[in-house]
């Protein structure tokens, strides 16, 4: 160990056996960013573009027309490798009755049940989300306790990436195998990202800029020290990856180690604000890196599809490339991320089967119940999760509704829809990197920045509703009457996604009781993924009722607006104090706590659990 590292580790004392108290290094941050670069391509390029198309196309190759339930949807059923996506579009477009060209509906029979091929991918996604939720809950105990956090992250990454690569061998005759592989891949992706998110509060808590700020004199009343600390944080994040990745972020400091523990987390609003800003910047940088990787691979995949004549094999080939990208760039994360073991089970949980995987799973489900009970007494986490439930549902529903609207009512071709996806991703990168500057220019807090994103997001359904106004409708454009209007809305959607993805994740991390990261991020992920089934279902009902999608914009406008009053009620300072108090209360008698409680020693602990 380097001399500098030895000095650094003396600043803090281990709080439990195996506690990794080393300051966050540049190499460790690079490993965290690397996994975002590796895995974000799956959700953007696979789930957002090629995976649904591949599943639908393979089911279509084995399906029949809904209109007569006899005519095969594919004219080259026995030669799936020669089935051109463009040819399928042309063939299917022959069957429509007046008005704009609409792709004909095809059905397949699975265990005797008639299923629309367009719904096949959606059902596959729903099943994967259900399994994903169970898996996330079950593995949270092993992630929070012991040294399994990194092991699980790497394991899920390998299984998910290899599963995605296996699409290369899936042909339409075994399209159900493709559905199973998609379920495995999406489940592993979601679980791995929950584990990645659980590293974020730990990286922030041990970040040198936080430790440095904790050792310096209290801030002046004019906030000059807070501004200086913020500047240091900015410098560390902006140059952390570019500098020598093998060295610690912070060089050695002199200090009295006996008083270090009391100094590590001084409970002042300035420290809380500094950690939140740092968490937001790391999260934003990670999201931005992930989007950049997704854009690069998306362009490569589009070129591959064109070069291979847009066949069904082309779609399977790009899924292989997505899985290969995911696998290769997981390697730096596996090498550079530290395990950061969590606290061991307390004596009340230690038994013969405690350390077995069954014991971890049983403990995890009990912990979920306890987490839900504790959340009821953490007002700000409860408010935020309620807002996030609605907001994430709105994000997922707007994305799917917009694509469906563009296809069926604006008659946009697949290439144009792919271009919208690229534009949205570019805007997402800009959003991830620019919202921090916007918040500084306008002096916005993290919650206020999230609120600004919600207000901007609200413009999307409101713009679609303009099409109901007779004066606008008579113009023939505006209010989503022309295909080109989807492109600026894609920019708005991307900017909003870049901001919400980074700010919401880091904002929630500041409200989590230390030592319970994986459990609470599991709740965060379940709230995120579990909500996505409701919005699309309601949009489907509205569409069936009125015969078109545009009336669903009313529902979307309401859905996006509802999180706004909830976010206005969230107080991050109060939430941080409650989280630290709860963490201290949950520790067994005489154990070290994860940080220092607020200076107000007379403050009562949270309500009885």
UniProtKB/Swiss-Prot annotation:
Cellular localisation: Vacuole membrane
InterPro entries tied to this protein:
Atg22, Atg22-like, ATG22/LtaA_families, MFS_trans_sf
Glycosylated residues? Answer: 244, 309, 443
Give positions of region: Disordered: 214-238
UniProt cross-references to Pfam families, sorted A to Z:
ATG22
Top-level lineage group: Eukaryota
Name of protein = Autophagy-related protein 22-1
Q: Which GO cellular component term is one of those annotated?
A: vacuolar membrane
Q: Which UniProt keywords apply?
A: Amino-acid transport, Autophagy, Glycoprotein, Membrane, Transmembrane, Transmembrane helix, Transport, Vacuole
Q: Which spans does this entry mark as compositional bias, Basic and acidic residues?
A: 225-238
Described by its record, this protein's role is as follows: Vacuolar effluxer which mediate the efflux of amino acids resulting from autophagic degradation. The release of autophagic amino acids allows the maintenance of protein synthesis and viability during nitrogen starvation.
Q: Which family does it belong to?
A: Belongs to the ATG22 family.
Q: Which organism is it from?
A: Neosartorya fischeri (strain ATCC 1020 / DSM 3700 / CBS 544.65 / FGSC A1164 / JCM 1740 / NRRL 181 / WB 181) (Aspergillus fischerianus)
